[in-house]
């Protein structure tokens, strides 16, 4: 510690136990995290940064960031909707694309700057292959990818550029997490719920976010073989 600090330095520490402390510091970079129930949309946990006192900016719901490779699974999901199969072969090889007048040609690369020839769709998403993703986007059309991203509420009026297939457009972590819920719940569109219910001073519920109905709950008893059937009206993507 003598190499790091000198007498008079003001530092942050965290109390552990038995009069022991660990060093703590304000991070130079902040981030966000969202934990969501994929079936109801309830936000179970959300953090928008290190300290609300130091910054009220919520990096989970307000910060626009490029999702990058986190967007690729949606491109592959759309490919499955357009007659691709997990075993469809796609060329993983260098490609050069024109971006327009007076613009440099775009030459996307895989991470590691290697390419592997014909590979299956499954391999493309498992290994996060950039070149395969771009070729899929070329074949199914960037317009379809843009429309699909709007249906999932990831982007609003995205510019139809082929680079968006690699996650170049911007969105929030909350929107991206909501879209990922569709992979878990069978393709249903989820809206994030931050307020579960509101009750007045007498305990009466004046607002409830729960929209699902249990249509046979009255017919279910302890000895009954019937199980509660909870149905929702969520739309399929």
Model regions and ranges:
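Mid-domain, small-residue-enriched loop/turn segments at the edges of structured enzyme/sensor domains
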Residues: 103-108, 141-178
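Conserved catalytic neighborhood of penicillin-recognizing serine enzymes
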Residues: 39, 84-145, 189, 201-237
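Extracytoplasmic
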Residues: 6-10, 28-31, 38, 52, ...
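Generic, well-ordered alpha-helical scaffold segments in large soluble proteins
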Residues: 78, 82, 127, 135-139, ...
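Short helix/strand-bridging catalytic loops that position acidic/His residues to coordinate divalent metals
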Residues: 54-65, 163-166
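A penicillin-recognizing enzyme superfamily signal
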Residues: 1-34, 46, 53-57, 127, ...
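Conserved structured catalytic cores and adjacent interaction surfaces
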Residues: 50-51, 79
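Active-site SXXK
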Residues: 40-41, 61-92, 124, 179-183
